[in-house]
Design a protein with these regions (language model features):
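Bacterial Sec-dependent N-terminal signal peptides
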Residues: 1-22
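Structural motif
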Residues: 19-32
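Short beta-strand/loop motifs in extracellular/secreted proteins, especially
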Residues: 31-35, 67
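Short amphipathic beta-strand segments in non-cytosolic proteins
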Residues: 34-46, 106-110
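Short, acidic Ser/Thr/Gly-rich low-complexity loop/linker segments typical of extracellular
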Residues: 42-56
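Short Pro-Gly-centered beta-turn/loop motif in secreted/extracellular proteins
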Residues: 54-66
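A short, solvent-exposed loop/turn motif at the edges and junctions
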Residues: 68-81
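Surface-exposed, low-complexity/disordered segments
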Residues: 89-357
Length: 357
């Protein structure tokens, strides 16, 4: 019996360490939440909190017959390598983006009621790994300084859909593409109510829940970086509504703040936000689960304090916005140095979609 137990422990050890891991090139620190795409634009995988690639990743890339894999993370340069190079590499290194951000000048805060954040958003939804919907545009967020409630108003947008992709049935459509809502955990005040912290170094803290690492707070070039896993396969969220069964087993958020203080961060100094969600869905128990994933990003362009809000019509968050509405190509030049274009494979897939005008 002891021999069997030792064998199980040994095999578990070997199997866990056979997983590839993604590291920061200069510091050899593991990178969580790296998205991995095929050369056809399919989202194949997302690394976990410790930077490990999932154990079934190699089976996935073999089934897709991709020649290359592309690694995407908002804090690092996009990297593409061949399948041969991937299999011959023990670890994958990504190079950090070196970015000097300009200070955002804001108006006097006396007597104001709202904070307005104007920025560029983009959102893509995957159906069984393939791009299905795409929205991007310019949006104003209005945040009440008294209640914290947030309203959003889209000024311009583009809308694309791949109509060849089918969802659960002709009657059921699951869509979370569109303007994202800022998560409550983007503020220090809220995050400390649920999580604890452990100091890793002078520039890094790990974020813990039930003594398990769920993310990190890092300072870098006078900015603060937040990375947090809210839901994963180990702590998924299951829901049922109108006969629909869903499981949220991937929900990660990342953010950058104009602050190097690990205590002083909230929406007033937010300059970048990203989230990725993954759902398993089915209409009834006889069906197989369908896989839906969506990424949302927001890049701050302007910040202003207001006494009142002029707009009176607002958008619903996580709702596909159509048709396209714009006077000029707002997407050509984004005035936020954190902005990186999508990998070419994903851009090509979006360009093959039909724009809804």
């Amino acid at each position: 019996m002891k021999e069997i137990l030792y064998l199980i422990i040994y095999l578990s050890f070997v199997f866990s360490y056979s997983q590839k891991r993604i590291y920061e090139l200069e510091k050899q620190i593991a990178i969580p939440f790296v998205e991995i795409y095929s050369d056809a634009g399919d989202l194949i995988d997302v690394t976990n909190e410790q930077g490990y690639i999932n154990q079934n990743f190699e089976a996935k890339i073999n089934s897709l017959s991709t020649r290359n894999v592309i690694f995407v993370h908002p804090f690092f340069e996009i990297k593409q390598i061949s399948i041969e190079e991937y299999f011959n590499s023990k670890i994958i290194n990504l190079k950090r983006n070196v970015i000097e951000l300009k200070e955002v000048i804001i108006s006097n805060k006396r007597g104001v009621k709202y904070l307005k954040l104007k920025g560029y958003f983009r959102s893509v939804q995957m159906n069984e790994n393939k791009p299905h919907y795409f929205n991007d545009g310019i949006v104003n967020y209005y945040i009440s300084l008294k209640t914290g409630k947030i309203k959003s108003k889209v000024l311009y947008n583009r809308s694309f859909e791949d109509k060849s992709l089918k969802q659960l049935s002709g009657l059921y459509h699951f869509s979370i593409v569109g303007v994202p809502l800022f998560n409550d955990l983007l503020t220090h005040k809220n995050i400390i109510n649920k999580y604890s912290f452990n100091k890793e170094s002078d520039k890094s803290k790990s974020i813990l829940f039930d003594n398990k690492t769920k993310g990190y707070l890092n300072t870098n070039n006078d900015n603060l970086e937040l990375q947090l896993s809210i839901n994963s396969k180990e702590d998924s969220k299951k829901m049922k509504l109108l006969g629909m069964e869903s499981e949220l087993d991937l929900y990660n958020i990342s953010a950058i703040y104009d602050s190097n203080d690990k205590i002083d961060f909230d929406l007033t100094n937010l300059i970048f936000f990203k989230e990725i969600r993954g759902y398993n869905l089915r209409k009834n128990k006889k069906q197989k689960f369908s896989r839906i994933e969506a990424t949302h990003e927001f890049f701050l362009l302007e910040k202003e304090y207001l006494e009142d809000i002029d707009d009176n019509k607002f958008n619903i968050n996580y709702s596909f916005i159509f048709p396209s509405s714009y006077d000029s190509p707002f997407w050509v030049e984004i005035g936020n140095k954190l902005y990186q274009p999508y990998p070419t494979s994903l851009l090509n897939s979006i360009q093959l979609m039909k724009e809804i005008k």
